[in-house]
């Protein structure tokens, strides 16, 4: 399937070079389009030309691009337009070994397949304590009954530790049972003045410490923590004290936007508003997938099918901009006048 996707991407990118009618195209573009268009026309009985000039010819070339991304993504959109009918024979065109694919497209698909098929540590965009259902006021001493050391979540990146006088304890549990981290990078600081249980201001004694695996860590210095070693805090003073723990970032095997080059830019290109036709077409295609129709996904796509579809749809979005197709789509009402921010804003609400 990688070769089919590489051919589809190659053909669409070749079509995207036809910005001007009289442009002198590269020889490899002529070779790619010459073979692809002939094969496509022969199997589908359509009449795509290599030099589209009229609106009808531009539509036909865009239909070919659309057929190819649907075939490569193994999607069937059904009846979405009175003017366009998906040609299921297109998969036979892309399976033709005579159609060449470029080194660039082959490398893109190889990277996509390789990265979506494995896992690697990457910096996560969300705070480590994002899933905490409850937070505590920052700088407010809080001690659970029967404990001398209590940890509390303040925000998605901040936690604090309340310690009784002379208290010592392991706070490793603060980092456990969440996010499956490979490495956590955090800083701890002494809270100089805090509010005690009665609401009065109180100073944290000097000499409070934090150690990881038995090694004391300096306050205000980033600590690389693997989540396995014990994390002990100690308040040797005669009064209550507090420290703050800020998780700067953490690494885990969850997929991010950096799993594939320019994935975030591809997603923006797919979900950007070009006109009502593109807005409706994108929704009609994504409606057959697990990706959102109109709003980018909260979490990065991580499986091969969705990442491949984003790459192919981004190339199709470029073809849409270059070929400027104009056809009817069920449920889409054309608008009059230029596209501005207000028009785009209205499309997403």
Curated annotation (Swiss-Prot):
It is found in: Virion. One of its GO terms (cellular component) is viral outer capsid. Glycans are attached at residues 148, 287. Keywords: Capsid protein, Glycoprotein, Outer capsid protein, Virion. GO terms for biological process: fusion of virus membrane with host plasma membrane. Its main location: virion. The keyword ATP-binding does not apply. It comes from the Viruses. Pfam families: Orbi_VP7. GO terms for molecular function: host cell surface receptor binding; structural molecule activity. The VP7 protein is one of the five proteins (with VP1, VP3, VP4, and VP6) which form the inner capsid of the virus. Belongs to the orbivirus VP7 family. This is Core protein VP7. It comes from Epizootic hemorrhagic disease virus 1 (EHDV-1).
């Amino acid at each position: 399937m990688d070769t089919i996707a590489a051919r589809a991407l190659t053909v669409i990118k070749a079509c995207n070079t036809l910005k001007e009618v009289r442009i002198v195209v590269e020889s490899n573009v002529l070779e790619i389009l010459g073979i692809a268009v002939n094969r496509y026309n022969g199997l589908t009985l359509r009449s795509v030309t290599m030099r589209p000039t009229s609106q009808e010819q531009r539509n036909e070339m865009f239909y070919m691009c659309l057929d190819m991304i649907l075939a490569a993504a193994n999607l069937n959109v059904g009846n979405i337009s009175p003017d366009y009918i998906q040609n299921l024979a297109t998969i036979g065109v892309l399976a033709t070994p005579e159609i060449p694919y470029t080194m660039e497209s082959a490398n893109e698909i190889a990277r996509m397949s390789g990265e979506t098929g494995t896992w690697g540590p990457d910096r996560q965009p969300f705070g480590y304590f994002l899933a905490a259902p409850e937070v505590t006021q920052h700088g407010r001493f809080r001690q659970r009954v029967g404990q001398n050391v209590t940890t509390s979540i303040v925000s998605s990146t901040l936690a604090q530790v309340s310690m009784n006088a002379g208290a010592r304890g392991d706070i490793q549990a603060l980092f456990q049972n969440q996010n499956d981290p490979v490495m956590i990078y955090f800083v701890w600081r002494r809270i100089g003045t805090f509010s005690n249980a009665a609401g009065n201001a109180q100073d944290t004694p000097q000499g409070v410490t934090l150690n990881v695996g038995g090694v004391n860590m300096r306050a205000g210095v980033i600590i690389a923590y693997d989540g396995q070693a014990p994390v002990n805090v100690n308040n040797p003073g005669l009064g209550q004290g507090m420290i703050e723990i800020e998780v700067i970032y953490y690494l885990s095997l969850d997929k991010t936007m950096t799993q594939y080059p320019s994935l975030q830019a591809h997603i923006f290109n797919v979900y950007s508003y070009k006109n009502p036709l593109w807005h409706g077409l994108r929704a009609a295609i994504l409606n057959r997938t697990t990706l959102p129709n109109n709003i980018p996904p909260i979490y990065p796509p991580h499986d091969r099918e969705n990442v491949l579809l984003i790459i192919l749809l981004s190339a199709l979005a470029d073809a849409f901009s270059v070929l400027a197709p104009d056809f009817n789509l069920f449920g889409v009402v054309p608008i009059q006048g230029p596209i501005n921010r207000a028009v785009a804003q209205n499309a997403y609400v």
